[in-house]
Regions:
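A short helix-loop-beta-strand connector motif used in the catalytic cores of GNAT acetyltransferases and
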Residues: 49-62, 93
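Conserved active-site alpha-helix within GNAT-family acetyltransferase domains
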Residues: 110, 122, 134-152
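Conserved acetyl-CoA-binding loop-helix of GNAT-fold acetyltransferases
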Residues: 96-99, 105-118, 145
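A conserved beta-turn-beta hairpin within the catalytic core of GNAT-like acetyltransferases
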Residues: 80-94, 104, 126, 150-152
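Conserved N-terminal entry element of GNAT/NAT acetyltransferase domains
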Residues: 1-16, 24
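Conserved beta-strand in the GNAT
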Residues: 63, 69-78, 93, 98
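Conserved GNAT acetyl-CoA-binding A-motif
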Residues: 120-131
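Conserved GNAT-fold acetyl-CoA-binding loop/helix
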Residues: 27-49
């Protein structure tokens, strides 16, 4: 059962499907930390965010499509640094990269990432960051496998 998977820029009509995949991603992530529990209307906020950024030159929203179904997506942006503090003026931020359960471990995530990194490179961005849950071993393994290196650890205190 090999299906051709196409990686392409997201279109407005893809937004509800991406929002559904976002729900799947968040439900997957909450098993590692309850902090990732989504709100009841979180998917609508996600859809609104994507709608606001889909045509933005500083955003790259890609989808993986198989048999006319969206099976993965990657949401990324160019972020600005304070030029008075850091030599690096801009960097790439990957907010989400998700592949639906039945299509995982088939190289789709890596293909989405490669195309995203290529987009950043064409924009003159040479550093890309991603936030990974510390207890999500499968995500940490994926990001390490594709060349990412830990550089900061965020900590929290519940009061």
């Amino acid at each position: 059962m090999t299906r051709e998977v196409i990686i392409r820029k997201a279109r407005k009509k893809d937004i509800p499907l991406i929002a559904e995949l976002w729900k799947e991603l968040m439900d997957f992530n909450k098993q590692y930390d309850g902090h990732w529990s989504r709100s009841e209307n979180g998917h609508q906020s996600c859809a609104d965010f994507i709608n606001d950024h889909i045509a933005d030159d500083a955003s790259c929203i890609l989808v993986a499509e198989a048999d006319n179904h969206i099976v993965g997506y990657c949401l990324s942006d160019i972020c600005k640094c304070d030029p008075q503090l850091l030599k690096v003026k801009e960097y790439g931020q990957i907010s989400n990269l998700a592949v639906t359960k039945n299509y995982r471990r088939k190289g789709i995530g890596e293909r989405l990432l490669r195309k995203t990194v290529n987009w950043f490179s064409k924009k003159g961005i040479y550093r890309v960051e991603v936030c990974v849950g510390i207890s999500n071993k499968s995500a940490r393994k994926f990001w390490t496998k594709v060349g990412f290196t830990p550089f900061v650890e965020n900590m929290f205190l519940e009061i």
